Amino acid sequence: MHNHNNRLVITPGEPAGVGPDLAIALAQQDWPVELVVCADPALLLARASQLNLPLQLREYQADQPAIAQQAGSLTILPVKTAVNVVPGKLDVGNSHYVVETLAKACDGAISGEFAALVTGPVQKSIINDAGIPFIGHTEFFADRSHCQRVVMMLATEELRVALATTHLPLLAVPGAITQASLHEVITILDNDLKTKFGITQPQIYVCGLNPHAGEGGHMGHEEIDTIIPALNTLRQQGINLIGPLPADTLFQPKYLQHADAVLAMYHDQGLPVLKYQGFGRAVNITLGLPFIRTSVDHGTALELAATGTADVGSFITALNLAIKMINNSNE
């Protein structure tokens, strides 16, 4: 294992939210890797004292070998906030700060300095209010690493759900599903299940778009015109695909027990099942990037900032999965 492969970068996200609290909570235990937090050191130290938790920071040095993180400490890649942070109060003045932390962490992950990037929650609305067009982390990282196509996947211990389309109005979904887009999404999904999850022959179950997967064309034509031909082409390339199946059929234990991943056609087709089954234990993963990226599955929880009641479970799960994916990639 290379030294830098033992180094993960973390972006706590929105400074007024629970992200800084969670970064400090992560620091309260030992980790087998070095955790480099891209944030304002003054923000973390102030929040740690508000939470009454011990925190020592050491400045990140790229030329030094990675060290396993000891409880009570974090390595810091510093970016300064523009205005004073009040826990629970959004300030448009710090939007550029948030984006700068993402850019710095992303560049380090692209260059291979960091083996993985783990993100805390950002407040999309306040970034956009600052005049910075921002759809989400996924799109930001894709753009910055010049990836034409990435895939959003959420995972729990028992279930992985990838999305054929992500943050689109429902009205725009059918037009966004083409044979070409399905080809790209499924190829990335299959490849990353092999390389980052260590699954030699992934079985991917695919949802139809319409109720009853179109009922043979009586309830929509997307399955017949687009989804089935795309799956047949991919099967000829050796990808193991089952479907399209009606989503309400597919999300039953008898099918899911054989699925390495489920491909849902749109955001709210696949994610409610997964969230119900594993909220707080789910991890958001971006597939198709030139680096490993995992994320918490919750928002900024402004009302919990600096209260000491924020749950670090999702962040720990996201970190542990990133470490597992690094190990799979190195094998």
Swiss-Prot record:
Cofactor-binding details, from the entry: Binds 1 divalent metal cation per subunit. Can use ions such as Zn(2+), Mg(2+) or Co(2+).
Swiss-Prot/TrEMBL catalytic activity: 4-(phosphooxy)-L-threonine + NAD(+) = 3-amino-2-oxopropyl phosphate + CO2 + NADH
Cofactor(s) essential for the protein: Zn(2+); Mg(2+); Co(2+)
Pfam families the UniProt entry points to: PdxA
UniProt pathway: Cofactor biosynthesis; pyridoxine 5'-phosphate biosynthesis; pyridoxine 5'-phosphate from D-erythrose 4-phosphate: step 4/5
Coiled coil: none
Residues that, per the record, bind a divalent metal cation: H167, H212, H267
GO MF entry, a single one: cobalt ion binding
UniProt KW keywords: Cobalt, Cytoplasm, Magnesium, Metal-binding, NAD, NADP, Oxidoreductase, Pyridoxine biosynthesis, Zinc
InterPro entries per record: PdxA, PdxA_fam
Compartment annotation: Cytoplasm
GO BP, one annotated term: pyridoxine biosynthetic process
Enzyme class: oxidoreductase
GO cellular component: cytoplasm
SUPFAM superfamilies cross-referenced by the UniProt entry: Isocitrate/Isopropylmalate dehydrogenase-like
Residues where substrate binds: H137, T138, K275, N284, R293
EC number: 1.1.1.262
Additional remarks: The active site is located at the dimer interface.
Assembly and interaction partners: Homodimer.
Summary of the function given for this chain in its UniProt record: Catalyzes the NAD(P)-dependent oxidation of 4-(phosphooxy)-L-threonine (HTP) into 2-amino-3-oxo-4-(phosphooxy)butyric acid which spontaneously decarboxylates to form 3-amino-2-oxopropyl phosphate (AHAP).
Family to which the UniProt record says this protein belongs: Belongs to the PdxA family.
HAMAP family, A to Z: PdxA
Protein name: 4-hydroxythreonine-4-phosphate dehydrogenase
Gene source species: Yersinia pseudotuberculosis serotype O:1b (strain IP 31758)
